[in-house]
């Protein structure tokens, strides 16, 4: 056989071999995971923490879920009150559209934002983070973005299951439209909150209700079916969610209450994204939902939506909500606020 033909045959054989190998699951060796040196000391401290020992434990009764909820709300409320005090933000409970909300106002509302309004949908895997604890992300946005924010304290199981939370978000949005132009408003949230914000867009669009001028989608829980590379690559590396076997997966299914989790109102990545408002998405390189964020960003772009993606070094799931003194936290919200400023009318 001529030398050139032999080389071609060898390359073909190697190609077939590699293709066959790539079709199989890969096993990677155990290795240490260093804390990066080029992030803030605050983020380094978060990155270095071990995963919670009880990450794979969750209640198996409605009473157990309710107790977990009360405990989470109590600790989250303390965090929110202290954060609002540090950042000079006022938080006032009120009702919009029959739903309990909190009006979150910075001490230094930007002149350009006087007629603008943001609506925030809280995180918590659909079952945690209610009450005044629901205001943490709104407080950060108010302080660092200089916007007035309405934090939606939507209903959660075991008191109310899918689609109650979605109904509440849409009800607040429709109420907000009575006093503000849709182009003057944005909706944002993290994790389950981001998924609910997207689902609210589908519901509003289907009902002929105007959509906001922009969206902020932080580490969105966009796919409950388990699709996504980072569910494997960041398992046990993300020290917040930890893995799909952790708390958040059963919590989301508890909310779904037997409903098909591939429904776009639960897994919005499978919905029709065309015509949605401009969106900014946020994640971290260690986030278990990094792939959900990246895949959603690509699908938004493929659907003709103006979408921007920011990914932060070494962050696990939504760690920008955990320390208001970190420069990365300020940067996350300043980037989102800048995006909103470009897309909202005044």
Language model: regions and residue ranges:
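Bacterial N-terminal signal peptides that target proteins for export
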Residues: 1-9
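Bacterial N-terminal signal peptides
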Residues: 9-19
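Conserved, well-structured beta-alpha core segment at the onset of a catalytic domain
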Residues: 5, 17, 197
């Amino acid at each position: 056989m001529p030398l050139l033909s032999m080389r071609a045959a060898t390359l073909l054989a190697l190609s077939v071999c590699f293709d066959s190998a790539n079709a199989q699951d890969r096993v990677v060796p155990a290795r240490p995971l260093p804390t990066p040196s080029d992030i803030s000391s605050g983020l380094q401290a978060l990155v270095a923490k071990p995963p919670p020992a009880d990450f794979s434990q969750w209640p198996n009764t409605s009473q157990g879920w309710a107790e977990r909820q009360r405990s989470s709300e109590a600790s989250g409320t303390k965090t929110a009150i202290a954060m609002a005090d540090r950042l000079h933000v006022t938080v006032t409970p009120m009702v919009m559209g029959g739903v309990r909300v909190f009006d979150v106002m910075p001490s230094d509302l930007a002149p350009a934002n006087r007629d603008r309004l943001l609506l925030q949908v809280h995180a918590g895997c659909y079952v945690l983070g209610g009450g005044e604890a629901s205001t943490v992300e709104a407080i950060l946005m108010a302080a660092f973005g200089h916007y007035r924010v309405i934090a939606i304290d939507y209903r959660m199981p075991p008191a109310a299951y899918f689609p109650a939370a979605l109904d509440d978000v849409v009800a607040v949005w429709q109420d907000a439209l009575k006093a503000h132009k849709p182009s003057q408003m944005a909706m944002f949230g993290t994790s389950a909150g981001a998924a609910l914000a997207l689902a609210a867009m589908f519901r509003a669009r289907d009902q002929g209700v105007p959509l906001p001028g922009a969206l902020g989608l932080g580490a969105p829980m966009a796919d409950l079916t388990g699709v996504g590379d980072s569910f494997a690559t960041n398992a046990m590396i993300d020290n917040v969610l930890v893995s799909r076997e952790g708390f958040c997966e059963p919590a989301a299914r508890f909310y779904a209450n037997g409903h098909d989790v591939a429904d776009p109102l639960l897994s919005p990545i499978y919905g029709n994204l065309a015509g949605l408002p401009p969106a900014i998405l946020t994640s971290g390189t260690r986030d278990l939902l990094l792939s959900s964020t990246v895949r959603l960003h690509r699908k938004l772009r493929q659907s003709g939506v103006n979408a921007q993606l920011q990914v932060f070094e070494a962050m696990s799931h939504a760690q920008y909500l955990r320390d208001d003194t970190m420069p990365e936290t300020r940067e996350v919200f300043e980037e989102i606020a800048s995006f909103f400023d470009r897309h909202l009318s005044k």
